[in-house]
Curated annotation (Swiss-Prot):
Positions with a binding annotation for a divalent metal cation: D24, H26, H59
Taxonomic path: Bacteria, Bacillati, Actinomycetota, Actinomycetes, Kitasatosporales
Bilayer-crossing regions: none
InterPro entries assigned to the protein according to its UniProt record, in alphabetical order: MECDP_synthase (IPR003526), MECDP_synthase_CS (IPR020555), MECDP_synthase_sf (IPR036571)
Cofactor comment text: Binds 1 divalent metal cation per subunit.
Keywords: Isoprene biosynthesis, Lyase, Metal-binding
Function according to Swiss-Prot or TrEMBL: Involved in the biosynthesis of isopentenyl diphosphate (IPP) and dimethylallyl diphosphate (DMAPP), two major building blocks of isoprenoid compounds. Catalyzes the conversion of 4-diphosphocytidyl-2-C-methyl-D-erythritol 2-phosphate (CDP-ME2P) to 2-C-methyl-D-erythritol 2,4-cyclodiphosphate (ME-CPP) with a corresponding release of cytidine 5-monophosphate (CMP).
Entry's EC annotation: 4.6.1.12
Descriptive protein name: 2-C-methyl-D-erythritol 2,4-cyclodiphosphate synthase
Coiled coil, from the record: none
SUPFAM superfamilies attached to this UniProt entry: IpsF-like
Species for this entry: Streptomyces griseus subsp. griseus (strain JCM 4626 / CBS 651.72 / NBRC 13350 / KCC S-0626 / ISP 5235)
Length: 172
């Protein structure tokens, strides 16, 4: 894509998209509420262990946004060394991550996230989750899910993982 500069005789420099990848992994922990993709999942088993609500979808999306913009990672911005973020909702972290990325001179094109695990069952609430995530980011967020066919920690039901990509454009 080439953007035109109004009144200029030649096209402006091409707008180069920047892509980032993010991951997040949490173990299940009895006694915690299960938050995933910005939603509370009643009846889907125990929640996830973590400094915040351990929402692997929101956290992976944050990491992908920071990666695309070259602005560090989730731990740098919201890690255990930052007590003000203890217990924070993943959707709050995602909203703040999007703000940080935009303040860094970038616009967000989109984010895609995949949950790896046998629960929660994403399909039944996919549209609701995508709406909540997209509102937090201020750009389209798509959500998919996969299992690991009984292999590894997700297959054994010990936890879940989130994998994300984000596309951003420099605006400044």
């Amino acid at each position: 894509m080439v953007s035109e500069t109004p009144g200029a005789g030649s096209p402006a420099a091409p707008v180069i998209p920047l892509v980032g990848i993010g991951t997040d992994i949490h173990a299940f922990e009895e006694g915690r509420k299960l938050w995933c993709a910005g939603l509370k999942w009643e009846g889907e088993g125990p929640g996830l262990a973590g400094h915040s609500d351990a929402d692997v979808v929101a956290h992976a999306a944050c990491n992908a946004l920071f990666s695309a913009a070259g602005l560090g990672d989730l731990g740098q911005h919201f890690g255990t060394g930052r007590p003000e973020w203890s217990g924070a909702a993943g959707i709050t972290l995602l909203t703040e991550a999007a703000r940080i990325v935009r303040a860094g001179g970038f616009e967000i094109g989109n984010v895609a996230v995949q949950v790896v695990g046998s629960r929660p069952k994403i399909g039944k609430r996919r549209e609701e989750a995508q709406k909540v995530l997209s509102e937090a980011v201020g750009a389209p967020v798509s959500l998919s899910a996969a299992t690991s066919d009984g292999l590894g920690f997700t297959g054994r039901g010990e936890g879940i993982a989130g994998l994300a990509t984000a596309l951003v454009y420099r605006t400044a």
